[in-house]
């Protein structure tokens, strides 16, 4: 692939871009979202010897090179020889705004300490809260810019990021603003942990709803809660989520990461957009999700990082649930920004096919974020967010474990540096 001489500077917006001579242009089949069911999830559209034409930041045409008509006007060209093009990847669950490091805790866990033990001792999430509060808005913006560059380099063009490492009014709102200003989808994770200045979870929920929610609802697109032993119970989660729904926020839950604590039925009852993690979800929860419109967002890196069982991805797929994939990128339990690694783990550890995994981190992840009408597919009218892989077969995204085959990322029709 020859890109060095034809890629414009990242600050220059391209009006019309032709990506030509692609080995493949690949996208989940169909036009609807979300995608569910084995047959639909395994259907991909593959155009060989392909071109993609982008105009005004959107895809205007895709086809075989032999069908390409002469183009009028000033057109930037990008040589895609030997490359497969896929939709820009969508990471619908991250904690990408944080300060500090938890490398020391990683070493302690490697020696046998558990995530829950570290959290109970004042480490874990609370150690990141201390560092994040001290960073200030400018420090948080710088941290997100760095983390965002890592994500972009691995093919993520659309991302969500949560608050939840401030747990006070000013830091929580600063985190949400930083995400919005970076072009991400901000989620208020006000109920992530109980900060040390509060005696109990109920008192903290009172504070969060009274003092933070009114302003958070003006910035965030969704609200999230960590429903788990040692964090917030089902009654506290319900109170928090019902108030957030009343403020106009879409609802999401962290649930069943370590124990089944009522998160799945609560998500279904409250018509949440997603319930995330699900490492501990049993057959009843799988069936209930399959009969609902709540998406199951699976985070295999977190399971690997914490040496936990993988989520029941294959069972959820076979039952017909809406399944999305994400990194859970965070400093403590999933220090990984790579959706290609998530795809590989989903195939090798959760027995998903490459096509299912691709749909789960494009169309279905975009559905979770309310963006499936404009990102997640290579199709005319969609935003021109495109990833070129330096492989002629798109399945190398999953097949070459640990490698980064992302050769070029196009965002809104403009190649990035």
Region annotations inferred by a language model:
Residues 250, 259-377, 389-394, 401-403, ...:
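Active-site-adjacent C-terminal substructures of enzyme catalytic domains
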Residues 123-145, 149, 157-261:
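Metal-coordinating catalytic core of metallo-dependent amide/deamination hydrolases
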Residues 406-417:
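Short peripheral tails and domain-boundary helices/loops at the edges of structured domains
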Residues 22, 52, 57, 82, ...:
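Divalent metal-coordination and catalytic microenvironments
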Residues 1-70:
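N-terminal metal-binding scaffold of metallo-dependent hydrolase/deaminase domains
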Residues 18, 75-79, 186, 409:
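Conserved beta-strand scaffold positions in the cores of enzyme catalytic domains, especially
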Residues 80-143:
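Metal-associated gating/positioning segment near the N- to mid-region
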């Amino acid at each position: 692939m020859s890109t060095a001489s034809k890629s414009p500077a990242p600050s220059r917006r391209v009006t019309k871009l032709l990506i030509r001579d692609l080995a493949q242009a690949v996208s989940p089949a169909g036009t609807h979202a979300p995608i569910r069911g084995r047959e639909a999830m395994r259907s991909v559209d593959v155009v060989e010897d392909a071109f993609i034409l982008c105009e005004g930041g959107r895809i205007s045409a895709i086809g075989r090179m032999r069908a390409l008509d002469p183009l009028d006007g000033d057109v930037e060209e990008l040589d895609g020889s030997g490359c497969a093009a896929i939709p820009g990847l969508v990471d619908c669950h991250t904690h990408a705004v944080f300060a500090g490091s938890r490398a020391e805790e990683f070493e302690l866990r490697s020696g046998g300490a558990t995530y829950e033990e570290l959290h109970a001792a004042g480490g874990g999430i609370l150690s990141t809260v201390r560092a994040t509060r001290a960073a200030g808005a400018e420090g948080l913006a710088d941290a997100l810019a760095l983390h965002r560059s890592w994500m972009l380099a691995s093919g993520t063009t659309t991302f969500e990021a949560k608050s939840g490492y401030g747990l006070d009014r000013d830091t929580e709102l600063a985190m949400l603003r930083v995400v919005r200003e970076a072009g991400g989808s901000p989620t208020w994770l006000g109920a992530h942990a109980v900060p040390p200045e509060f005696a109990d979870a109920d008192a903290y929920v009172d504070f969060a709803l009274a003092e933070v929610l009114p302003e958070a609802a003006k910035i965030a697109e969704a609200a999230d809660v960590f429903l788990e032993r040692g964090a917030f119970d089902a009654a506290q989660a319900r109170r928090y989520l019902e108030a957030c729904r009343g403020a106009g926020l879409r609802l999401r839950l962290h649930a069943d990461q370590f124990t089944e604590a009522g998160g799945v039925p609560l998500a279904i009852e409250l018509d949440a957009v997603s319930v995330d993690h699900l490492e501990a979800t049993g057959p009843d929860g799988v069936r209930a999700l399959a009969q609902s419109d709540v998406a199951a967002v699976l985070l295999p890196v977190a399971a690997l990082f914490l040496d936990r069982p993988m989520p029941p991805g294959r069972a959820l797929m076979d039952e017909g649930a809406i399944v999305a994939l994400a990194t859970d990128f965070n400093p403590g339990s999933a220090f990984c920004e790579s959706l290609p690694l998530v795809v590989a783990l989903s195939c090798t550890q959760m027995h998903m096919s490459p096509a299912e995994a691709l749909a789960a981190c494009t169309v279905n992840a975009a559905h979770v974020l309310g963006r499936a009408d404009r990102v997640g597919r290579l199709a005319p009218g969609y935003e021109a967010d495109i990833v070129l892989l330096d492989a002629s077969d798109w399945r190398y995204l999953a097949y070459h474990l640990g490698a980064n085959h992302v050769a070029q990322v196009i965002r809104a029709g403009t190649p990035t540096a």
